Swiss-Prot record:
It comes from Magnetococcus marinus (strain ATCC BAA-1437 / JCM 17883 / MC-1). Interacts with translational regulator CsrA and flagellin(s). The keyword Chaperone applies. It is found in: Cytoplasm. It comes from the Bacteria. Gene3D superfamilies: BH3618-like. Acts as an anti-CsrA protein, binds CsrA and prevents it from repressing translation of its target genes, one of which is flagellin. Binds to flagellin and participates in the assembly of the flagellum. PANTHER family: FLAGELLAR ASSEMBLY FACTOR FLIW. Keywords: Bacterial flagellum biogenesis, Chaperone, Cytoplasm, Translation regulation. One of its GO terms (biological process) is regulation of translation. This is Flagellar assembly factor FliW. InterPro entries: Flagellar_assembly_factor_FliW (IPR003775), Flagellar_assmbl_FliW_dom_sf (IPR024046).
Length: 162
């Protein structure tokens, strides 16, 4: 199978690679089939590419790579709809937003993780009221340093005139 996307051009894939989000994502109800692939080599980021609407792609992460103290509870109803029998069959991803020109301000939606059964490729976005929908990925102290570095490199470039 293949899709023609605006971001990646032609993507060839096997049907067994599709993740099925039967309820879509919040705000994107028509996108129910997705492909997931690494953002880059050795990256903690992934692309979640809509098969139904090829112009739609999201950056996602495994939130446990960034936040070791997370605990997501998958309600029985959600586990049932995903046909989840074992906790080791679950993978959880969260959507990331990166403001243009301000990567140090990137955030992830911990309040709306996407839960995927890796055995049958069924997934669902669930709601977790205990977490923020705009959780910074970079700690405040490090964010300040990155902002300062960005300012100095821009300032140095402009001052140098070349």
């Amino acid at each position: 199978m293949e899709i023609q996307g605006t971001r990646f051009g032609t993507l060839e894939f096997d049907e067994k690679e599709i993740i099925y989000l039967n309820e879509g994502l919040l705000g994107f109800p028509l996108s129910k089939q997705f492909l997931m692939f690494p953002y880059g080599e050795d990256s903690s980021f992934f692309w979640l590419q809509s098969v139904d609407e090829p112009e739609i792609a999201f950056i996602v992460i495994n939130p446990f790579d960034f936040f070791s103290d997370l605990e997501f509870a998958v309600e029985d109803e959600d586990a049932s709809s995903l046909v989840l029998a074992r906790s080791e069959d679950v993978e959880i991803f969260t959507l990331v937003t990166i403001p243009e020109g301000r990567p140090e301000e990137m955030r992830t939606n911990l309040a709306g993780p996407v839960v995927v059964n890796v055995q049958n490729r069924l997934g669902k976005q669930i709601l977790c009221k205990d977490y923020s929908p705009r959780q910074p990925l970079i700690p405040d102290s490090m964010r300040s340093q990155l902002k300062e570095q960005a300012r100095s490199s821009k300032g140095g470039h402009v001052a140098g005139g070349r």
